[in-house]
Every structure is written in structure tokens, then in C-alpha cells.
């Protein structure tokens, strides 16, 4: 069994890159892949007034119904003043272990 992790800020939003990643995760053959999808709700940006789409419960249900293991993490802010768009006050690194993949 191949373990794969998808990791996306605002990953259960209904649109854009998020929806494509959800679809890929949902349609990987579950007899070959164990799929984890790490996501957070939208959070305010530092350095921009842009508002990311928030979690859409229909997308949560869609991915769950296709055998995807959802793992929700917290982010207080996304700092877009830095080239790496740092996640501020996140517990992501407490939940994700790269050695599992």
C-alpha cells in the first residue's frame, strides 16, 4: 500500500486548486493508495486583505465518501509578506510526520 499526503491551506474550499486536489485524492484507487488530506479552514492574511474561500462541508463529505482520511489542522494567520507564505500559530507540524509517507 502506498501512503500519500495532500497538504493544502484552505484545502476543503469549493473551487480552484483545492477542488482539483480533492478530486485527485478521491479518485486514487484505494486498493493501492492510503490517502491522507491535511487541510485547514481559511485564515486571515498578514500583508493582504484577500480572503481565501472557507471550508465547504459538501467538499468534506465528498472526500470522506471516497475513502480519503481528512486531517484538519489549525492556522491563525497566513503571512504573505514572506516568500514562503508562513503559517502563523499552526499545529500542522504536530500532526504531520513525513516519515509516514
Protein language model annotation of sequence segments:
Residues 18-23:
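A conserved mid-protein helix/loop that constitutes part of the nucleotide-sugar donor-binding site
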Residues 8-14, 27-85:
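N-terminal strand-loop element at the rim of the active site
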Amino acid at each position: 500500500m502506498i501512503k500519500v499526503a495532500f497538504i493544502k491551506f484552505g484545502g476543503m474550499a469549493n473551487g480552484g486548486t483545492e477542488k482539483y486536489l480533492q478530486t485527485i485524492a478521491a479518485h486514487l484507487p484505494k486498493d493501492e493508495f492510503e490517502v491522507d488530506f491535511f487541510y485547514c479552514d481559511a485564515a486571515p492574511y498578514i500583508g493582504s486583505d484577500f480572503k481565501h474561500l472557507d471550508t465547504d462541508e459538501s467538499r468534506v463529505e465528498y472526500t470522506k465518501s471516497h475513502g480519503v482520511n481528512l486531517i484538519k489542522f489549525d492556522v491563525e494567520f497566513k503571512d504573505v509578506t514572506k516568500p514562503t507564505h508562513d503559517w502563523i500559530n499552526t499545529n500542522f507540524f504536530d500532526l504531520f510526520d513525513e516519515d509516514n509517507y
